[in-house]
């Protein structure tokens, strides 16, 4: 299950080989569409990468730090450094292909 993260220890949670941070908000319709997709992807790739959910409501400092201007946005971290950002809703198969490539890097 993805870790629901707060700003308190965000930097600690994004360390490691590959961490996928799902920036979302409870009022966001597209975020709700992504929830089941992200759950399936975490089941598939959770043994090879970490999945973190970050609610941007009340935590705008972290979102701004990584230039997250809209949700849903996925930011991929390697060893604590933000490497890529994907914004919007994508089909499960497209994200699965993307994660396969990123895990292999």
Question: Which sequence ranges carry the predicted segments?
Answer:
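Short cysteine clusters
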Residues: 28-31
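N-terminal "domain-start" segment that seeds a small globular fold
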Residues: 1-13
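Thiol-based oxidoreductase modules, predominantly thioredoxin-like and allied folds used
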Residues: 5, 23, 35-42, 46-61
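Non-catalytic, surface beta->alpha helical segment in thiol-disulfide oxidoreductase systems
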Residues: 78-105
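CheY-like receiver
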Residues: 12-13, 62, 98
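Structural micro-motif
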Residues: 19, 60, 66-75
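Conserved hydrophobic/aromatic "anchor" residues
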Residues: 10, 23-24, 66, 77
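Short active-site neighborhood of thiol/selenol oxidoreductases, capturing the structured segment around
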Residues: 14-24
């Amino acid at each position: 299950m993805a870790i629901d993260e707060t700003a308190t220890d965000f930097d600690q949670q994004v360390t490691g080989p590959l961490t996928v941070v799902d920036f979302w908000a409870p009022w966001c319709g597209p975020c709700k569409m992504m929830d089941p997709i992200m759950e399936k992807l975490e089941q598939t790739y959770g043994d090879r990468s970490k999945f973190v959910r970050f609610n941007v409501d009340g935590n705008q400092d972290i979102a701004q730090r990584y230039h997250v201007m809209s949700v849903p946005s996925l930011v991929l971290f390697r060893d604590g450094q933000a490497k890529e950002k994907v914004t919007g809703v994508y089909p499960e198969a497209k994200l699965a292909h993307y994660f396969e490539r990123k895990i292999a890097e």
